[in-house]
């Protein structure tokens, strides 16, 4: 049985994602913030943490990236991809909607809907979509933009549902564990994630990306976050196709390790969308294995 911490309270999209990772007997534990969910794993209070990492409309989730870059390292072992549309909840006693609360990422994804349908309402940021529902229930605000599942947990009425400015919006979530972990087996449709602190000099990022390009590795995400301690320095969060068990990926990670003053491995796991890696000619795993075997034979004096 595992305890899975998640960015709560109950009724968030992250809770929905966490449920996709559950096995029989597992327990969900709500955390007030993303850093607290991850720290629960670091302290041994939870076996894993489910956190949002990126949204197709608003991009990366800064709180997740920043929390994974520092502190005791955690490793991702699985990902989930959820379609994102919202419900607008209110109390029975509310007449005119004057205030609407939600998490900033949620508000950004329904901005146009709010302008068209509640043009006079003041928009207020909350810690999470479910926290907004709690605040509406307590009378602090008139309405909340929430995950559809929130209505099952809070005694509020649905003012609108299937709300989204972008119909095919999705959010990706990671399941993080504390090492040592058993890495998932490669599937052929995998993603590897790292964070690299590169030297502050001309061409550093180009050098990192070249290490991937020369090995035929396709980049799926690149984000930069400030180092916090050193002004003008950044950490690069890089996702790419493939699994660390593959020779070409392992070779690339070794090269990145040589070039960067710090590289943190954030996991290799099956892609939730099932998209297989695009492998260029001469970049297949067998190509790397054959080349390594040839060099070994040359070193032994057996091959010219």
Curated annotation (Swiss-Prot):
Domain Prephenate dehydratase: 3-178
Site annotation Essential for activity: residues: 171
Domain ACT: start-end pairs: 193-271
CDD domains given in the database record: ACT_CM-PDT, PBP2_Aa-PDT_like
MF terms (GO), sorted A to Z: prephenate dehydratase activity
GO process terms (BP): L-phenylalanine biosynthetic process
Catalytic activity: prephenate + H(+) = 3-phenylpyruvate + CO2 + H2O
Pfam families attached to this UniProt entry: ACT (PF01842), PDT (PF00800)
Gene3D superfamilies found in the cross-reference section: 3.30.70.260, Periplasmic binding protein-like II
Enzyme class: lyase
This protein's pathway: Amino-acid biosynthesis; L-phenylalanine biosynthesis; phenylpyruvate from prephenate: step 1/1
The protein's name: Prephenate dehydratase
GN (gene name): pheA
């Amino acid at each position: 049985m595992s305890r899975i911490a998640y960015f709560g309270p109950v009724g968030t999209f992250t809770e929905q994602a966490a449920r996709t990772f559950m096995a029989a007997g597992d327990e969900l534990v709500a955390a007030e913030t993303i850093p607290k969910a991850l720290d629960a794993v670091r302290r041994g209070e939870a076996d894993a943490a489910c956190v949002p990492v990126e949204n197709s409309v608003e991009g990366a989730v800064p709180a997740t990236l920043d929390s994974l870059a520092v502190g005791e390292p955690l490793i991702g072992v699985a990902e989930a991809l959820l379609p994102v549309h919202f419900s607008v909840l209110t109390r029975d006693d509310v007449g005119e909607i004057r205030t609407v609360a939600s998490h900033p990422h949620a508000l950004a994804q329904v901005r146009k809907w709010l302008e068209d349908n509640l043009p006079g309402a003041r928009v207020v940021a909350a810690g999470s979509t479910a926290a907004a529902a709690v605040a509406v229930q307590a009378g602090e605000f008139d309405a909340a933009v929430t995950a559809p599942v929130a209505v099952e947990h809070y005694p509020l009425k649905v003012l609108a549902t299937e709300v989204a400015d972008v119909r095919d919006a999705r959010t990706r979530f990671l399941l993080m564990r504390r090492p040592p972990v058993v890495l998932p087996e490669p599937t052929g449709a995998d993603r590897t994630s790292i964070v690299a602190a590169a030297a502050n000099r001309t061409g550093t990022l180009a050098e990192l990306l070249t290490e991937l390009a020369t090995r035929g590795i396709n980049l799926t995400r690149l984000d930069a976050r400030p180092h916090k301690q050193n002004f003008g320095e950044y950490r690069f969060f890089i996702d790419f196709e493939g699994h660390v068990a593959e020779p070409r990926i392992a070779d690339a990670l070794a090269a990145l390790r040589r070039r960067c003053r710090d590289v943190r491995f954030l996991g290799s796991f099956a892609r939730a969308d099932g998209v297989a890696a695009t492998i260029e000619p001469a970049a297949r795993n067998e190509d790397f294995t054959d080349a390594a075997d040839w060099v070994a034979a040359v070193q032994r004096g057996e091959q010219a």
